[in-house]
């Protein structure tokens, strides 16, 4: 069983804990967050998107009691001071969003006694970026100490792109993610460096940059430089959708494309990670879906023989958090 510490108990930190509950291969033993234990307990127990946690949660002095298990809570601003070693932490989930550079994230290992770090965001100079089901087999404990789980959008894009590339070959393409608003945005207009990002999140469709297509090259090297794209933040709290348009190496039909997705979703390394649906569903139907990417088969289009457009739904919090759990367990099995 791998013992995990969470640095940053925000949306992803709390989703990760919920996803990990009851998993016999993983135990959360410590949390570091600047917020007091009472507030952390309340936000874990009562979630506006996930509902009430179906397990008892209590706050104690310097700890949380979750489903009968004690989780020690630290409150260190500097990661170098977090006593992970004392808590017996093997793997740290770096979920603050602030320490995404390798040098900063590695402090959990070099100064604090953890064995590995998983960054819950795109990393900078990280040892390896992993998208489960796509390139998880590349993890090598002899080489990889600071590992990134990529972004929720990279996890939504990569499985679909891999299937298309393996089956038909991708020449180049464009991606847009119609993305739920996040905590980086504000309820009302306020000064920001990004003047579009300065606007009220719930009142507009807000164009944003997205590094998901560029990051895809770190996960599928043969697609490096072949995709680019952006994001449109929209007034929904969760669930996003990747719109991917690619030029393939050969002519195809929509049915061929959908058959490839059905097959990949049913068996092999993408089973349970990639999904496929022919139902006429909307974003709210995918809230709480643990898969990384669900192909909307009704929306697959082909024009000119080899230009293809597909849509892939993803719960940008819950699906991503489940992959964090999977990655921590995988790293423990392969060696820390």
Task: Give residue spans per PLM region.
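C-terminal active-site/capping subdomain that shapes the small-molecule cofactor and substrate pocket
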Residues: 229, 241, 245-336
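Acidic, glycine-rich segments within the central catalytic cores of soluble metabolic enzymes
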Residues: 166-237
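Short clusters of hydrophobic/aromatic residues that line enzyme substrate/ligand-binding pockets
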Residues: 64, 130-132, 146, 187-188, ...
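A broad structural signal for alpha-helix termini and local helix breaks/kinks
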Residues: 96, 112, 168, 220-221, ...
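Conserved active-site and cofactor/substrate-binding residues in soluble primary-metabolism enzymes
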Residues: 7, 11, 35-38, 87, ...
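Small-molecule pocket liners
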Residues: 128, 203, 242
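Generic structural signal for residues in well-ordered beta-strands
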Residues: 71-73, 227, 310
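N-terminal Rossmann-like NAD(P) cofactor-binding subdomain of oxidoreductases
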Residues: 1-198, 302, 326, 334-335
């Amino acid at each position: 069983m791998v013992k995990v510490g969470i640095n940053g108990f925000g949306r992803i930190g709390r989703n990760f804990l919920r996803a990990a509950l009851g998993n016999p291969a993983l135990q959360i033993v410590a949390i570091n967050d600047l917020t007091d234990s009472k507030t952390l307990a309340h936000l874990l127990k009562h979630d506006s998107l996930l509902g009430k946690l179906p397990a008892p949660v209590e706050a104690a002095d310097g700890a949380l009691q979750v489903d009968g298990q004690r989780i020690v809570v630290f409150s260190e601003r500097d990661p170098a001071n977090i006593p992970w070693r004392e808590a017996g932490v093997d793997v740290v989930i770096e979920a603050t969003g602030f320490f995404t550079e390798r040098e900063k994230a590695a402090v959990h290992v070099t100064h604090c006694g953890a064995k590995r770090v998983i960054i819950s965001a795109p990393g900078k100079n990280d040892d390896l970026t992993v998208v489960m089901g796509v390139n998880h087999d590349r993890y090598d404990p002899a080489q990889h100490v600071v590992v990134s789980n990529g972004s929720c959008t990279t996890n939504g894009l990569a499985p679909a792109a891999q299937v298309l590339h393996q089956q038909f070959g991708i020449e180049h393409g464009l991606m847009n993610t119609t993305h739920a608003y996040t905590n980086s945005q504000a309820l009302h207009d306020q000064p920001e460096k990004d003047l579009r990002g300065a606007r009220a999140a719930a009142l507009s469709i807000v164009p944003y940059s997205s590094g998901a297509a560029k990051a895809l090259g770190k996960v599928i090297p043969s697609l490096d430089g072949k995709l680019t794209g952006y994001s449109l933040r929209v007034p929904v709290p969760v669930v996003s959708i990747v719109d991917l348009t690619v030029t393939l190496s050969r002519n195809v039909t929509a049915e061929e494309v959908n058959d490839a997705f059905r097959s990949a979703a049913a068996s092999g390394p993408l089973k349970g990670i990639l999904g496929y649906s022919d139902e006429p569903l909307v974003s709210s139907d995918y809230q709480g879906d643990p898969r990384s990417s669900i192909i909307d088969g009704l929306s697959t289009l082909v024009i000119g023989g080899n230009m293809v457009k597909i849509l892939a739904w993803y719960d940008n919090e819950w699906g991503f958090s489940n992959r964090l759990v999977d990655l921590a367990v995988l790293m423990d099995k392969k060696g820390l």
